[in-house]
Amino acid sequence: MNKKFTDEAWDDYQYWVETDKKYLKRINQLIKDIDRNPCEGIGKPEPLKANLHGYWSRRIDKVHRIVYTVENKQIVYISFRFHYDK
């Protein structure tokens, strides 16, 4: 699938590139897994509810999540830092 990063997601990704290679490795593993199957796999995929209906999250760790959606065979990454209710 094609990948698209929102400006916030790209800034978050660059933050991990510059600050923590361990987190970056985990994020890259999750991105690979999301590409294979957006709704199943590692990181406890969870469909979000209420005002985030249509979005999914995966755990990077206890604090940080990847938030993304799938639109027309394209994965759109929304964020890579913090929790989705920030």
Model-flagged regions — what are they?
Residues L24-K32:
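PIN-domain endoribonuclease scaffold, especially VapC-family toxins
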Residues N2-K4, D11-L24, K49, W56-R65, ...:
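Enriched for short, Lys/Arg-rich terminal
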